[in-house]
Regions:
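Non-catalytic connector elements of ABC transporters
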Residues: 12, 248-315
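Helix-to-loop junction immediately C-terminal to a conserved catalytic motif
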Residues: 48
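ABC ATPase NBD coupling module
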Residues: 65-80, 104
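Conserved ABC ATPase "signature" region
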Residues: 109-126, 178
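Conserved ABC ATPase signature
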Residues: 130-134, 138
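A short, proline-enriched helix->beta-strand linker immediately N-terminal to the Walker B motif
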Residues: 149-153
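Conserved ABC ATPase "signature" C-loop
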Residues: 209-210
Length: 315
């Protein structure tokens, strides 16, 4: 089990991480979400041992994780970290990059291991290609295979699918997260992609300004967000006075409402004017105005700009 106990970290007099504590059980997939600059990447580096803590402790089982002050070579053998810059060797082939840290004593075993990992990340056909000739998305997939090569106990992933095409990313995510579950590899992923959070994480940690402000299942955080900030990490969200939605007569009390939770009705207190319409494939996202406030809602068909409609909650 990984455990962080009240850790803090300062960079150039700015407190980047402040009093963070949480624990992760073996085999769990945990997502870290939050706005850019909230400390997600720094937290992964601290867990890996790349930085020294100002305060607190990090433990993996009975092993204390410490920074470069205590280790000549930072990082732990049983933990693998995939940074956003990939760190591939450009002048060696894809298969050589993936097998870089595997022993050469049992060459057939090494060859088989590399082949299976390249199949996992759908890069088998590029095995003999030098890394410098790959696209950013292809390099990212190779880097992912490489950190899995030695089958770590804990995997730290920083935006691991950010450069991969959408049509390929969905299947790749399913393959990788299924593999991690099958092998009981604990994983922490820092991401901006709500699909990675909702579909694959067992728990989600929400960060804001270097602090952990929420830890819960992704389903709970999505359905019952503690704040507009948390809800906004999953997509567009509206803050609507409850009396406009027939909840109460208290105009100061607001309800967080996602676009899919609103629908057009014949009449209601929420009268909006259509400002813009965005085609989303199976529906339109409508941007509208209510008393100088923006309200987003989904609609099955396009609406002309300036159209007045009434909204209420989907029953």
């Amino acid at each position: 089990m990984l455990e962080l106990k009240n850790i803090s970290f300062t960079y150039l007099k700015d407190k980047v991480i402040s009093n963070v504590s949480f624990a992760i059980s073996k085999g769990k997939n945990v997502a870290i979400i939050g706005e850019s600059g909230c400390g997600k990447s720094t937290l992964l580096k601290l867990i890996y041992g790349l930085y020294d803590l100002d305060e607190g402790e990090i433990w993996h089982g009975d092993k204390s994780i410490r920074g470069p002050k205590y280790n000549l070579i930072p990082g732990e053998d049983y933990i693998k970290y995939l940074a956003q810059d990939f760190d591939l060797m450009p002048y060696i082939t894809v298969e050589e990059n993936v097998g870089k840290f595997l022993s050469n004593i049992y060459k057939d075993k090494k060859k088989s291991r590399v082949a299976s990992l390249l199949e996992l990340v759908e890069m088998s056909e590029f095995s003999k290609v030098k890394a410098k000739y790959l696209s950013g998305g292809q390099q990212q997939r190779v880097a992912l295979a490489r950190v899995l090569a030695l089958e770590p106990e804990l995997l730290l992933l920083d935006e691991p699918f950010s450069q991969i095409d959408s049509f390929r990313k969905n299947n790749l995510q399913r393959n990788v997260f299924h593999y991690l579950k099958e092998k009981q590899i604990s994983c922490i992923i820092a991401t901006h992609d709500s699909a990675e959070v909702l579909s694959f994480s067992d728990e989600t940690i929400v960060m804001q300004k270097g602090k952990v402000i929420a830890i819960d299942t992704p389903k709970t955080l999505y359905e019952k967000p503690y704040s507009a900030y948390i809800a906004s990490l999953f997509g567009e969200v509206n803050q609507i006075p409850m009396h406009l939605l027939n909840f109460s007569n208290e105009p100061q009390t607001e309800q967080l409402v996602y676009p899919h939770q609103l629908q057009i009705v014949e009449n209601s207190k929420l009268e909006v004017v259509v400002k813009q319409s965005y085609f989303k494939g199976n529906h339109y996202l409508i941007e509208s105005i209510f008393k100088n406030n923006t309200v987003f809602f989904n609609n099955p068909f396009d609406l002309e700009l300036g159209t007045i409609v009434y909204l209420d909650l989907v029953v």
